[in-house]
């Protein structure tokens, strides 16, 4: 199924680029899947989910070589890429350009180190994770209550 997915994605990107050469593609997955039958696989290798940004004008070294983050950081990254310089935006988490800290449902990354959240010692980071989750859940449940002030 990996060959098929790669083939279909490649055909889609070629067709979209032919239609609009300025298209920006962000491709990621929703879970880690590795076909490695060794027990000597690191948590980083076992848990990593690929994400790439591709399009005209997007350099191959857009992110630091050791950049890591979460899906919640894709939207602010897009904002930084496409908004006019000096334009501001609000986000729960920083963009992938600031990838010192990230988390998912059970893991955290801090300064290039990955671990189980239950083992995280940094109380400030734990509080940030809990706050971001609380706000995200509230927005999912009550998002329609948010109104623009004009």
Q: Residue ranges of each PLM-predicted region?
A:
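Catalytic-adjacent loop/helix segments of enzymes that bind and process anionic phosphate/sulfate esters
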Residues: 1-8, 14, 46-49, 61, ...
